């Protein structure tokens, strides 16, 4: 029993060491990224602790950039387009990049519906928003790529729908210049 207790204690200690090691290597990577960016006068703050990557930078001229990759919280309002009904976010697929007055948002979703049904939903949504804008619709065997460009507002929305096994993968990207 004493040996079993010692083995259990050793196992717990080693598991704890794994967490400590993981945290230490995370911090080492953060510092390496920050250090490499500082060579051209850019100040960076990198955080890998939340399951994704958050980074904020200020370059030598004072321009700031914020980036979240993997776990950015992105809403329908942020994108300017609804999520397909019943779809679920694809883990690790969201990204937000804000640089000066420009922003780029990306979101991955998964639906159990067929690609043609999902594409029809987004085609209708983009058509309803298309007055005075350019709508491009490229269908292919396994889905569709839809793009709405607003040259006046310097913005675009892209929706890519692709066939997944018995379902659909959806990628939505919103780009805006001069965003607040």
List where the protein language model places each region.
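Bacterial N-terminal signal peptides that target proteins for export
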Residues: 1-5
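C-terminal motif of bacterial Sec signal peptides marking the signal peptidase cleavage site
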Residues: 13-16
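An acidic-aromatic pocket/loop used at catalytic or ligand-binding sites
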Residues: 18-180
